[in-house]
Amino acid sequence: MLNEIEVGLICLSERKKFKEVYEEYFTALKYFAMRYVKDEEVACDLLQDVFVKLWEKGDRFENEMQLKTYLYRVVRNHCLTYIRDTQRKEKRMEGFEVEETEESFVHQMIEAEIYALINDIFEELPDACRNVYMKSLEGKSHKEIAEELHIAITTIKKHKTNANNYLRERLMGLLCFMMYLGI
């Protein structure tokens, strides 16, 4: 959450506040944009455009919820514009309409926030545990990981166990929330 010490307007023309907003929302907005464009690089490019426009406009917001809603809507609209433009360029626009309900928009917004939260929790792991776990997720065996990282297989197992325990503990509440939402 943004530092809400100051009460009043959130002004994006202030460099410090803009940087704070950028760092707070970029990851979640990237996952949100990827739901539309299906390409991380394109999603990042679109987000850069959105943040440049926000900086140039220097918008002011009454509170963080107003800012957050605005950011998600602008990113969604930017993604939809990109999709339409891409379709036109490829001359496949015939019959293409983007239909989206408010419910699916909120659902996608929540999913993007959840992915960002999971990513943040994963980043909390110690480097050694995270590296071993990533290689395991890539489908590598204990032996392959041990050879690549020059550590013992027992150490690999210990890192994976520690990572699993930490992730299980940190994600339990999130899992219950996701099940409640039906995600």
Residues of each region from the PLM?
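Hydrophobic-face residues of short alpha-helical interaction/recognition segments
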Residues: 29, 33, 58, 71, ...
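Internal acidic/polar
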Residues: 81, 89-111
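N-terminal module of bacterial RNA polymerase sigma factors
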Residues: 1-28, 35, 183
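Conserved RNAP core-binding helix
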Residues: 21-22, 30, 40-56
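C-terminal edge and immediately downstream basic/flexible tail or linker adjoining helix-turn-helix-like DNA-binding
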Residues: 5-9, 164-183
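Helix-turn-helix DNA-binding module
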Residues: 123, 127, 138-155
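DNA-recognition helix of helix-turn-helix
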Residues: 148-173
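Sigma70-family region 2
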Residues: 12, 51-66, 86
